[in-house]
Amino acid sequence: MNKLTEQNLLKKSRFLKYSLLASISVGAIIAIPFEGMASSKQKALFQNALEKKLSLRLSQSNGNRDTTNTPQQIGTVIVPEPERNTYTSSEIREMEISKQSKASNPLKDIPIEDHYKKVARSKSDVGKARKVRPPTRSKTFVDTEKVEQNQNNYTHEPTEQTPQKPEIIITASSPTVSPASNGFVTAPNTPNTTLTSPEHYTTAPGTPSTPVTPYQPTPDSKPNDNLEAKTPPNTNSKAVRRLSFSSEPQQTVVQPSTQAKPPVPPKPLLLSSAGVVAKKVVSNILRVNEMLGIKLAEVESTIKNTQGKENKKPLQQLKKQIASSQKTTEKLKSEAAKIGIKIKELDEENKSLKTGRVKNKRELDKDNAKLKENNKKIDKLQQKLTNKNNEANRLSEEIDISVKKVVLIKPQVKAPVTEMPPAGSFLNQQQQLEVLTQQQKVNAARQAVVDKKRAEANGVKRNSAEYKDLISEREEIQLEQNQRHIAVEKTKKQQQAEDKEQRQEAQKQLSKIKKQEKAIKAASDEAQKILNDAKKEASRTKLKKLQEQMDNHVAMVTNDKIEENIKKLEGLALTPSTTSSAATISKQSLTAKSTMQLSHELQRTLPEDEDGYLEPIKVQQQPYTVMLSNQEVADPKSMDSGLGSLPSGIETDEDTEFNLGWGNGHHKELILSVDSKLIEKAAQLISGLDVKRSEILQTTSPSQQKSLNLALQGIENDYQEAIEVYQGLQQALIHKSEDIKAYNAEAEKRLDAIKSRADKYFNNIETDADVGFNQDWSNVHTQTAQSDSVLKMQQALLEKRSKEGSNPNFTTYLDPQPGEEGLKSIDSGLGSLPIDASVIPQYVEELNNLASFSSLNQIQQKKPLIITNMLLSETSALSDDEFRAVANEVHPKIRPILTYNRQKEKEAKLVEAEAAHSQVVQNAIKTPNSTQAKEAVENAAKLFGQYNNSFKLTQALRDEHRKKYYETPKKVTDSINSLDLAVPAESQQLKEPRSKSLEALDLAGSVSSQLKQAEYKSVLSPSSSVNSLLSNEDEQNHEFEIPKSLSFSFGSLNSDAESQQLKEPRSKSLEALDLAGSVSSQLKQAEYKSVLSPSSSVNSLFSNEDEQNHEFEILKSLSFSFGSLNSDAESNLSWDNTGDIGVGHRYGAEDSCPTPDQSSSKIANSSDKNSSETKLALLRTYQMAVIVKRQELEQLPSTSSGADQNTQKIKELKEVEVTMHDAINACIADSSKLNDVSFEEINEALKKLGSEIPESAISDFESKAQKDPEAILDGSILQEMLSSKDSLPSGDEEQEDTEVTESGIQKAGDKGLLALPVSSNECALALSDGREKECLALGDGSEEKEETIEQLSDSVEGNLKIEQEEKKEMQTQISKNAPTLNQAKVVNTIVNNMIRNRLDASMNMSNNMVAVGAGDEEESRIKRGLWMRGMYGTNNHGRVENMTGYRGTNKGATIGFDVEIDNNILGIAYSNVHSVFKFKNSKNNDKELIDSHVVSIYGQKELPRNFALQALVSASKNFIKDKTTYSYGDTKIRSNVKHSNHSYNAEALLNYNYLLQNKLVITPNIGLRYGKSRDGVYNETGINVQEIALTMKENNILSGIVGTKVKVPLKDVLKFNNLGLTFQGAVEHNFKEKTQRINRVVKIFDTEFKQNYAIPKQPKTSYNLGTGIIGSIKNTTISLDYNYYLNKHYRSHQGSVKLKVNL
């Protein structure tokens, strides 16, 4: 019984699987329609309606099974009858595996997505139908054995595979798919699908259950992977499926069932939200990008293992294609992400509209309209997402197709192979589990899992050999295909080389033929001229003789006879002599004789010429002569010699016997009566055949010419026949008119037959260039020239591409701040780096290679930083000279990063030394013996001193950052120093509390130092960037300050004893410091982990800044509160007069802490002007004064009177700066050198610079220098002295709480934070009234500590969020305020138009027409002219991409002088134009001022045949001033920019002057123009703008000009003469434009904002229209002109007035 059941179940499971496969492969019955529906909501609604309709029809068909008619049966499902089978399940499985064919099974290894959903059911409803989830679509490509998943379905579902094909015949009721509509065409009978519950192990009678295992996707099982997987995918072991197919009249089912099962409508698909769809599209594009990276790595690996350039060439092309596709996918991903954000915003807006308070009808209608509008936008955006996804999939498919053509080498990864356990054994386990207890079921399930794992292991071993064989076979096939492809490519190249040689040879022959044709044409023209002269002389001779005969017989003839004789004379005179092939009249018979005058009647009929000869009334047209390319004149001189004789058919004057009488002689005249049109037609036919034959020979290969041999022979025969007809027409001499008509008809018939045959030949010929027969024979010569030009263009294009292929335009921009995306592909592409003892040269070589690596994006510039750090680790032991030698070998683009990181490593060593110093100090404090403590401190000082000199050198390299290095921890250091110095003595009883306080202070410093050291090391890790190094410099400097304060505190151990009353408050403050140290440690530890993690990003760094600032605020507040404890009892604490205790705010007298007497806190006497500190400070002051003076001189305009003197002073000041810098460094290293410095000399030098410092300011400066010696080095106090000449800034007055003081802004910039209002400072620092007590009470309880910390943290976090928003807004402002777009070009265009009007071509006609030029003098005798022109114009430029447009005005003047000789002009002109451009959408009146100075040289050359050539060359220098206002929070920052622009222009125009009868002149012109514009690097200055730098940009444009001008003469009015109107129009087209990217850096409040501008190219086509009026009075010419210039983004109006005086 068990065997029978097992047999039946196995057969039924096979049938069900085969049926499922058949339904998918025949028409994609379910999968294809659902693909389109999943992309939008409308398709999902269509799916639900269709499923309901299908379920209704199925229920009707099941209910009326007996009453409905049987539809037409196309086919049936054939199910074999059950047979007895005695084989075991394992034997059956082995037989099935052995029967499977590797090549014949097209659906093998194709995973089919699970089309059904598990639905829970009760144990009693085992046999009932289950709900079915509609299947998702999957396209199956049989040929390539790939599966393409639906673009909107990204979830991996369990799949199922069927090993064999079923026997299936499709019936009329099967659902079909309409390709056109992409939807269902469903018949009434749709198969119902039922599913049994996986929770029950019993099955209904006759229902098969197939055990399956879950499918585990392998790394190679990607949709776009070409590697065939031998492993059959597993199926789900928990899902037991049962399918039943039924139709209305059919009784053929899988198993007969006695009970009718009503169909259950399927559950509709759950639509994903728009945001989820966008996220999935981005993930799909990212998957495609990763796949491209893998392919790129495989291609590069194959290239390395391939030998020979010919073999590597297709692989290199494939590599370029993959790299280009990867770049496109990156762009698609970014665009899809942006669209996803927009969709998410719209979706959230819709949700907010749907929810909320109760609304009235008007509000509801408004919300509904907004919802509809948002839904439409979402649909459009989703369509764009779909297109992006399709584009990514298309690129993936193209790469797959290209990869098939080559053999790629990649590591062979064994795919896990699983095996389906036998159905019988699994079924037996199910039957046994039904009767077992719960514990037995658990044991059986565990045993089933063990059996399953064993079966999988056996399957892996069994299939590994087959997998290896399959891989090897595939590699052999691909290798063979690759070799075949290479052979084909090689053959093609050889053929192309041969064809190129043949074309070159043909071109040489063609050039020779053209030269011969020119020679023949010249000879024929000369012969024709001689022949015409001979005809004229012969006609005159005949007329003279006729005149003599007529004088003798005048009296005897009547009027009628005279008229008859006149007609005969006309026929005789008008008869042509002969063609070029006939002989001509002898020169000896052309002698003229004196004759008598004709009678009066004859004279009125026959006119005479100047010499008295008779002239014919009409002149007959000369015969059309065409010289063929293959006809040559053997001896051109023979044509001249042939003129001396006449042919036999022509009689001379002596032979005509005129003396016998006029009417009595019989005269026979021979004429050439053939139609000249036929001759012309024959010539065109011959020329066309010759051209087409040569084109076919040039554009076809030799192998193709062999196949076209018959057609070419026919064309050759037609060519010879046409030549024969042509020669016959030229030589035909016919007497009778009937013969003439017959001959003409026969020749025309032959020509038409030749043309029709030629049409057939050319239509049947298919060449590589797609040559077709041209029906228009009049354009054959034009077509020949065009074909030659096309060949030249193609050759030029090929040469250009070959150059680009050999010298690619690699990206030179190296971004030191990469992201994490795309790094895997680059790392895999570049390969692993060697790690060896001598790897320094290899690293250098690798860096040099990466310098020219074609990066896909800025994200992929991570690799140079990684290699740079590796190189640094190898060169850490080298000396500075050795390291400098290594750095010189590195590429200049990467060398700055290498040297910068070297300096950072040095600073890291200083940090380690300082940490060791702090540790020694702590140990010394804990040591009971004071002698040992002193020794420990001395040892630590020695250890730290080893790096002190190098640290000072490092400071010299960072002068611009010193302020923020030392300003940040200044207040903390002051408070700690004051605290330590305030203790004059310490009693023996208070030693222990004092030790604890010092230990707490040192512990806080050491913890901070160690954490900073760890952070420093993390910054040097590969995941760091140069920006993060700069952002952490403030905190690094804090690390240097803490140990110095600790040394001060340790030095006061033996001081006097303090009072007993301070004991308890000091212990509380120590607890607060301990708390701060623990919080700092935790925060820094979290930050350190986040920085070191590979997945960290810029966002995580920003998020950690809140914690960092939180820690700083706690330390500051605790230090100040700790110091305030002693202020009540001690009178010698050192504090600042201003009470500067907050960021961006100074408290007043009532809010500040008590200020003790400062006299006791001074270390040295402040009145001592000769102290070393004072002298060093004065040296710094003098250095800063020199810098300020130099900057003032540099801001002066270069056009001022003393520009040369200013330049010389600037050079001298720069030399002084260098000298002072070296002197200060030397004094810092050796303080003994300060003895040579004189206070009076420095003060005198300062007086000379205009920056004298008063004595009050110096005393204040000395007091501050005493309290904070480090402030001297950073230069902050010196800057305050220079900014205020009367006294140093002592603090601003108290303002309102919500205002931001300027000092706060400055200090906020120094700390990298925005200035906070007073209320924020009170919350953050807890130093207002009543807050000191709260800070002192931090140690009372843990709850109060946590609350205070939370308050401080929330305040800092809120402030940082505000700061980030304002930085983002600032970045947006900078991106919109683009640099100069084309303002300089606008000025140059205006100037060129003014000069071009002077250079209008003026042909000196005899009718004294209006001068063509704008103000040119009519009289050609004028040699010199002086002219002036004034202009005014407006222009408007629209917004281009993300750059703001502008409106501008231009006004200026031009003066010129030229010399004119016979309408040939040469002159020079100077122009000065002032322009103002105001940027649109600017609330701050931002504008740009340009002063342009242009020098132009122009000329005009008059050419023959009314042509004239104009040329213009100009060079200009533009001085540009930009005035821009930035909004940084509530602060308005005004910046001023001064820089220059150099522009060069050159143009040439060819004019043709055409004069009409009414003195109207039309002048068409054509020409070229080239323009080059170049901006210099500039620095921007302004309030709080520390630095703005703009890299040099350059713009090159080559354009063509085509236009025309019309001059209309007018009548003279008043004293004006030569009045005329001018109209002009021109079209300018840019052929080539080259622009550079602009990198702009703006530094505000110590925050750098970087913006990269890609200057958009100007529109290709521009138009210029103009009109004017011109007139002259005596020697003065006046003209008025107007021009209108426009293109896609730009409009300009310009008017001008010109006055010219002829000298």
UniProtKB/Swiss-Prot annotation:
Q: Which domain of life is it from?
A: Bacteria
The primary site where this protein sits is membrane
Point to the regions of Polar residues compositional bias.
149-164, 171-221, 232-260, 1155-1169
Composition bias, kind Basic and acidic residues: at what positions?
110-128, 490-506
Q: Does the keyword Membrane apply?
A: yes
Tell me which GO cellular component terms the UniProt record holds.
cell outer membrane
Pfam families on file: Autotransporter
Q: What residues does the Autotransporter domain cover?
A: 1419-1703
Which regions are flagged for Acidic residues bias? 1291-1300
InterPro entries, alphabetized: Autotransporte_beta (IPR005546), Autotransporte_beta_dom_sf (IPR036709), OM_autotransptr_brl_dom (IPR006315)
Localized where?
Cell outer membrane
Q: Where is this region: Disordered?
A: 93-265, 490-509, 1146-1169, 1284-1305
Q: What is this protein called?
A: Putative surface cell antigen sca1
Species annotation: Rickettsia felis (strain ATCC VR-1525 / URRWXCal2)
